Amino acid sequence: MRIKLLLPLFALALALTLAACSNKGDQKPRPNIVFIMSDDHAYQAISAYSDHLTQTPNIDRIANEGMLFSNACVTNSICAPSRATILTGKHCHLHGKIDNRFPFDTTQVTFPQLFQAAGYQTAMFGKLHFGNNPKGIDEFKILPGQGAYYNPDFNTNDGKIRIEGYTTDVITDLTMDWMKNRRDPDVPFLLFFLHKAPHREWLPAERHYKEFTKKTFPEPPTLFDDYEGRGSAAREAEMNILLHQNWAGDSKLRPEVLDELGITPASNWDKRAMQNKYNRFTEEQLAAWNAVYDPIIEDFKQRYPTMTEKEQMSWKYQRYMQDYLGSIAAVDDGVGVLLDYLDEAGLSENTIVVYTSDQGFYLGEHGWFDKRFIYDESFKTPLLVKWPGTVKAGSKNDQMVQNMDFAQTFLDIAGIEAPSDMQGESIVPLLKGDIKGWDRDAVYYHYYEYPAVHMVKRHYGIVTREYKLAHFYYDVDEWELYDRKNDPMEMQNEYNNPEYAKVVAELKQKLDDLRVKYGDSAELDQKYIDLYNKK
């Protein structure tokens, strides 16, 4: 046991020594890094990717002045595991945070520790989602767990505090206060600007819900998907907007209205979720909320008795989009505030700005909300990078990059040696426009949280530009193959199609190779199943 504990400590000591030595003799000012991450922000809801749903002019500025990655993806599409992967540069089976329940292996070296040791000042504001004392961070104010949308609590260096206001705006204010008043102007900085929004249950700021509740959004062509042509995982997942999205907690009906109309709650926390929000509001906030949402509720009460299931689905989809996209609007506002300050303070030229999400999200595609699957809407994530003087403004990149690449990329940018056990690759060559040396032609994915909320089965898989092969396991043994070019919506599983037999064989071999490369195995699959069943 003593040897097991000493090895990570030795690795950290070695990494910190290398980090401290890496910048000796470096005459050029080391760049600042601003890492902006929202929660569950679908790439479909960023106008730099597609403007069919909403406009995000400030986030788009990062793309317009930098690079947009069209094939960025995650290793495990769920909040805390994704964040642990970003911090460690490793797949989940190595850092231990395989799902939102499992603990993070705190012996792991995180890249902020290396920045701190190399003389960077480090700060983190917003949602981390695991742990109350992030390693390698000089100053932090982070939401406990998921956090609230209004009048949030924060864990800080000095204990817990509560701040009145809308959480997205509060996080922006905390970030800007540090930038303007407590940042040492003579020392390079690593700043984490981490938003809770637009995570479920999607409460917009007052200025935005007044606007977005008046909008109507186009329905995706697969909103009424019947899952024919897919396996049991898609059919049995509990992510359908009509069946599984909460009437009160998500669609914002008053709990008593469900009783009045005889609506069965979608979950055992449906009514409680909305009541908790009401209890969180100040009197002024509640009055403003009711002034907008009460008429929506009254209109629904009049219409509901004659609504078909299809009409109910369409109504819930519109309510979902109004609040989800309304929540994003405040994130975009905050990004604009930060970008403006960087310009005004003369910091832009030596500051790398990154915008991403911890994963993608379903906005009605396949009738779903939430994430988890290897299918594109949850597997892919937005990634925009602005680096003046290095990244060509308005450029695009379609190479396959993953969130586990972020740690090594940031370390590379800062000239800090990366630990040898990190599994990603620096994307600095791609940022410089050099794709010749980038030879990644496939990525590995593994999702673990089952049986649990949303009931998305455990699966791992391989994704190439042309195909996607996934193995669903635990209570099933099913394979799925999708032709990404000919079936971009992933509607038809071709695994048993004889025409794809050669493709399946090649991908299975390549998948086995990736599992070996990244240290994953059937033994680890069973280990995590056994540990999960003990909890």
State each model region's role:
Residues K485:
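Residues forming the ATP-binding cleft of Hanks-type serine/threonine protein kinase domains
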Residues R2, P8-L12, L16, C21-Y473, ...:
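Formylglycine-dependent sulfatase
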